[in-house]
UniProtKB/Swiss-Prot annotation:
SMART domains: S1 (SM00316), YqgFc (SM00732). CDD domains: S1_Tex. InterPro entries: HHH_9, NA-bd_OB-fold, Ribos_protein_bS1-like, RNaseH-like_sf, RuvA_2-like, S1_domain, S1_Tex, Tex-like_central_region. Keywords: RNA-binding. The keyword Disulfide bond does not apply. The keyword RNA-binding applies. Pfam families: HHH_3, HHH_9, S1, Tex_central_region, Tex_N, Tex_YqgF. This is Protein tex. The gene is tex. Residues 760-769 have a biased composition (Basic and acidic residues). Transcription accessory protein. Exact function not known.
Length: 791
C-alpha cells in the first residue's frame, strides 16, 4: 500500500510522507502499518473495526495504538497545513531565505512554527515599528556593532523632531524598542528560555488577602511553591480552581526571583544567548554595556515575562487536563466493563426519605413488569408495609437480585431489605448496592421519556438502577459519561477533548462486548461501529415492525443501512439463536467462507463444532489462510469457534457492607471493612464502605510496595478490603488503607484536623511516598478539592 496514498482527508500540499514517518516513530510501528491504518481511517473505517478485522493490513495495531494514531494524525495534519500557510505568507512578503525555509521545514511543533513566524506575522503598529519609521534601526545596529561606542553620543546623530525624536534619550528608547522586539521574536532564544523556565521554574501560590475562611478548602496552598515539572495534574487543577474562585494568587517564577538586587536569571540568559558580551550588569560597566543590559531587562519585563507566564500556565493546564481526561477515560472504561449480573429478574430500589423509595421490577430481558412507591422512613415510617410490599413483589415476579441505589438513605434501605430477606428466607434473594450516579440525569432525559413515556420520572431512576446491575454497559451508554461521576475536575477541563475521549471509550467498550441486535436499545446500537443515532433508530423501528432479525444479512433491509455500514457494524452485532450460528459470534460475515472451508475439512456441521474445542484439534489455522485472510484473522476465527461471543467482562461478584456500619459515627480507626472502589484518581482511590461518604485510600496506602499509578492496583467497581485509619466526622473525611498492617490513628471525632487534613499533606513532591514502610501514610488533603468529584 503506497504510503503517500494514505491521507485522502488531508489538505492539498500537506506532506503525507512526513506525517506517516512521524506517526510510525511515535507509536513504535512500521511506516507501512501506519499508512494502512491512516488509509482505512480516511476511508471511513472505525477504530474498533480496524483493530478487530483488519489486523493483516495494520500489522496488528491494537485499539490503544489506533486511538493515539487517530488523535496525533489530526494534530500533524493541522501542523502541516499551518507550515504551508506560513511558508506561503513569508514567500509573498519576499523574505523567505533558504535558512528560514529549512528551519520551518524541520519544525516539529506548532509552537516552534509560530516562534519562527513571529517576525513576519502581520501585527498592529508597535513601538518598534514606529521607531523604525523614525529611522532609528541603524542606531540600534550601530550600538550592537561597536563595542567601544558611547550610545548617547551615537544617538545624538539620529534626532528627528518630525517623528518626536527630540533628544538622545528618545532616540535610545526607540533603539531599545527595536532590539527588544527583535530579541523577543528570536525563535531560538524563545525556545531556550521556555525550556529553562519549564525545567527550573516554580509555581508560587499565596492566599488572596481576606480569603482565609472562604478558602479553607485551599489552605494547603496559602503559602506554597513547587517545581513546574513535578506538579501532578490534580494539584494543578486544584490550584487553578482556587485562582478561579478568587482564593489563590498564582505566579510562575524562579528561586532567584526573590533576590531583587541581582539581574533576573532570564535577563542574564538573554544577554548570554545573544552574545552581547560580559559585564553588562557589573557596577563598573561601560555606557554601552549598561545600555545593552537595560535592553535585556526591557526585553524580559515588557516583551517576554507576561507572555511566558501566560504560556506556562497554558502548558500546565493543558498537561493537567490531558492527564485528568486520561484518568476519567480509564475509570469510565472500568465502569462500563464492570461485571454484569446477566439475565436475572431484578428489583431496583431507589432510596428516598420524604418522597419515599421508588421500586421497579424488571424481568430477565430488562422489561419493566411492576413498579411501586413505599414509605419506610420519615414522615410516614411505614416499615412493616414496605417489607410486605417488597416481599410480595419478589415472590410474584420470582426476583433473584435486589439492586439498591447508593444515595440518600441507602444504608437504611439496605438494612430494611436485609430484615425482609431474614423474614422471608424462602425468597432466596441477594441484595447489591449499586452506584446511582447519573440515574436522575437519565430519568429526566429525552431517552428515558421515549423509552418510558407512561412511567413517572421518579420511577425511571429505579429502572435504571435495576438495569445497570443486570448489564452496566447497556444501561450506562444512555447517560452522558460526564454525569456518571468518575472523573477528577471534569468540569474544569477542555469539554470538547473530554467528550471526544469519553466517546471513544464508550465506542471501544460497546464493540469489545458486542451487541444483541434483537434486544439492544437505540442508545446502545448507536455506539456500534459504523452506526449512528439515525441508523440505530431505524434498526429498532424495523425490529418493532417486522420482529426479530433472523440473520445478520437481514440488516441490509433496514432503511439507509448501506454496504459500508454493514461492513463496519456486522461483526459487532450478534443474533443469538438465529438461523446461522455464526451470527451469534464475532466472526465477520465476510469471513464466513473461511469457516465453510474449516467445516468442509472437518466434515461436520458448523453447529456441531461451535463451542467444541475438541472438534478443531485436528486442523491448524495456517491451513486456511489466503490472499484476503491472514493468520491473525484465521486465529481469531478459531478462537470464536471454540468460544463464540466471549465476553471480556469479569465474573459478577458483590461486596458485603458490614452490618451496623451505616454512618460516619459508626466508624472507628482500626475497623476492617469490605468496600467498592468508586473512583480512581492520581493520588489514590475512593472507596464506598456504606456510610454515605466515600473513604480515601491514598496512593501510599494502596500496597506494601511503591505504587506509581493507582490503576496498577485498583479499578473502579473492584471489591476491596480496607482498614479505617482516621475519621473526621465534622469534615466528612475517612482515611483508609489497603495495607492492613498499617497502624490506625487515635480516634478524631470532629475537631476538623483528621483524615489527612493536616496542612500540606498533599505536597507529594515534597513528601515522597514511602516504599515499604509500615506506618500510616500521610493521607491526601486533596479530598477537600475532590469533594465535588462525587456529584
Amino acid at each position: 500500500m503506497p504510503e503517500t496514498s494514505a491521507t485522502t482527508n488531508a489538505a492539498p500540499g500537506v506532506d503525507h510522507a512526513r506525517i506517516i514517518a512521524q506517526l510510525a516513530t511515535e507509536i513504535g510501528a512500521r511506516a507501512s502499518q501506519v499508512a494502512s491504518a491512516v488509509e482505512l481511517l480516511d476511508d471511513g473505517a472505525t477504530v474498533p473495526f480496524i483493530a478487530r478485522y483488519r489486523k493483516e493490513a495494520t500489522g496488528g495495531l491494537d485499539d490503544g495504538a489506533l486511538r493515539t494514531l487517530e488523535v496525533r494524525l489530526g494534530y500533524l495534519r493541522e501542523l502541516e497545513e499551518r507550515r504551508g500557510a506560513i511558508l506561503e505568507s513569508i514567500t509573498q512578503q519576499g523574505k523567505l531565505t533558504p535558512e528560514l525555509q529549512q528551519e520551518i521545514a524541520t519544525a516539529e511543533t506548532k509552537q516552534r512554527l509560530e516562534d519562527l513566524y513571529a517576525p513576519y506575522k502581520p501585527k498592529r503598529r508597535t513601538r518598534a515599528q514606529i521607531a523604525r519609521e523614525a529611522g532609528l534601526e541603524p542606531l540600534a545596529d550601530a550600538i550592537l556593532a561597536d563595542p567601544a561606542c558611547d550610545p548617547a553620543a551615537l544617538a545624538a546623530q539620529y534626532l528627528n523632531p518630525e517623528a518626536s525624536i527630540n533628544d538622545a534619550k528618545a532616540a535610545l528608547d526607540g533603539a531599545r524598542d527595536i532590539l527588544a522586539e527583535r530579541h523577543a521574536e528570536n525563535a531560538d532564544l524563545l525556545a531556550d528560555i521556555r525550556e529553562h523556565l519549564w525545567s527550573t521554574g516554580l509555581l508560587y501560590s499565596k492566599m488572596v488577602e481576606g480569603k482565609e475562611t472562604d478558602g479553607a478548602n485551599f489552605r494547603d496552598w496559602f503559602d506554597f511553591n513547587e517545581p513546574l515539572r513535578t506538579l501532578p495534574s490534580h494539584r494543578i487543577l486544584a490550584l487553578m480552581r482556587g485562582r478561579q474562585q478568587g482564593v489563590l494568587e498564582l505566579r510562575v517564577g524562579l528561586e532567584a526571583d526573590l533576590e531583587a538586587e541581582t539581574p533576573h536569571p532570564c535577563v542574564v540568559r538573554i544577554a548570554s544567548f545573544l552574545k552581547l558580551g560580559n559585564g553588562l550588569f557589573a557596577l563598573d560597566a561601560t555606557p554601552r554595556a549598561r545600555w545593552l543590559g537595560e535592553v535585556c531587562r526591557w526585553t524580559w519585563r515588557v516583551k517576554l515575562l507576561t507572555a511566558f507566564e501566560s504560556e506556562l500556565f497554558g502548558r500546565l493546564r493543558e498537561s493537567a487536563e490531558a492527564e485528568a481526561i486520561r484518568v476519567f477515560a480509564a475509570n469510565l472504561k472500568d465502569l462500563l466493563l464492570a461485571a454484569p449480573a446477566g439475565p436475572k429478574t431484578v428489583l431496583g430500589l431507589d432510596p428516598g426519605i420524604r418522597t419515599g423509595c421508588k421500586v421497579a421490577v424488571i424481568d430477565r430481558t430488562g422489561k419493566v413488569v411492576d413498579t411501586a412507591t413505599v414509605y419506610p422512613f420519615e414522615p410516614r415510617r411505614d416499615r412493616e408495609g414496605t417489607i410486605k410490599t417488597l416481599a410480595a413483589l419478589a415472590a410474584r415476579h420470582k426476583v433473584e437480585l435486589i439492586a439498591i441505589g447508593n444515595g440518600t438513605a441507602s444504608r437504611e434501605s439496605e438494612k430494611l431489605v436485609g430484615d425482609m430477606m431474614a423474614r422471608f428466607p424462602d425468597l432466596a434473594l441477594t441484595r447489591v448496592v449499586v452506584s446511582e450516579a447519573g440515574a436522575s440525569v437519565y430519568s429526566a432525559s429525552e431517552t428515558a421519556a421515549l423509552e418510558f413515556p407512561d412511567l413517572d420520572v421518579t420511577l425511571r431512576g429505579a429502572v435504571s438502577i435495576a438495569r445497570r446491575l443486570q448489564d452496566p454497559l447497556a444501561e450506562l451508554v444512555k447517560i452522558d459519561p460526564k454525569a456518571i461521576g468518575v472523573g477528577q475536575y471534569q468540569h474544569d477541563v477542555n469539554q470538547r477533548e473530554l467528550a471526544r475521549s469519553l466517546d471513544a471509550v464508550v465506542e471501544d467498550c460497546v464493540n469489545a462486548v458486542g451487541v444483541d441486535v434483537n434486544t439492544a436499545s437505540a442508545a446502545l446500537l448507536a455506539r456500534v461501529s459504523g452506526l449512528n443515532t439515525l441508523l440505530a433508530k431505524n434498526i429498532v423501528a424495523w425490529r418493532d415492525e417486522n420482529g426479530a432479525f433472523p440473520t445478520r444479512d437481514m440488516l441490509r433491509k433496514v432503511p439507509r443501512f448501506g454496504e459500508k455500514a454493514f461492513e463496519q457494524a456486522a461483526g459487532f452485532l450478534r443474533i443469538p439463536n438465529g438461523d446461522n450460528p455464526l451470527d451469534a459470534s464475532a466472526v465477520h460475515p465476510e469471513a464466513y467462507p473461511v469457516v465453510e472451508r474449516i467445516v468442509a475439512r472437518i466434515k461436520a456441521d458448523v453447529r456441531h463444532i461451535i463451542g467444541q474445542r475438541e472438534a478443531l484439534k485436528g486442523v491448524s489455522p495456517s491451513d486456511f489462510t489466503d490472499e484476503r485472510f491472514g493468520l491473525p484473522t484465521v486465529r481469531d476465527i478459531f478462537a470464536e469457534l471454540e468460544k463464540p461471543g466471549r465476553d471480556p467482562r469479569p465474573e459478577f461478584k458483590t461486596a458485603q457492607f458490614k452490618e451496623g456500619v451505616e454512618t460516619l459515627n459508626d466508624l472507628f480507626p482500626g475497623m476492617v471493612l469490605e468496600g467498592v472502589v468508586t473512583n480512581v484518581a492520581n493520588f489514590g482511590a475512593f472507596v464506598d464502605i456504606g456510610v454515605h461518604q466515600d473513604g480515601l485510600v491514598h496512593i501510599s496506602a494502596l500496597a506494601e510496595k511503591f505504587v506509581k499509578d493507582p490503576r496498577d492496583v485498583v479499578r473502579v467497581g473492584q471489591t476491596v478490603t480496607v482498614k479505617v485509619l482516621e475519621v473526621d466526622v465534622a469534615r466528612k473525611r475517612v482515611a483508609l488503607t489497603m495495607r492492613l498492617n498499617d497502624a490506625a490513628e487515635p480516634a478524631r471525632r470532629g475537631n476538623g484536623a483528621g483524615a489527612g487534613a493536616a496542612r500540606g499533606a498533599d505536597r507529594g513532591a515534597r513528601r515522597p511516598q514511602a516504599d515499604n514502610g509500615k506506618g500510616a501514610p500521610a493521607n491526601s488533603a486533596m479530598a477537600d478539592a475532590f469533594a465535588k468529584l462525587k456529584r
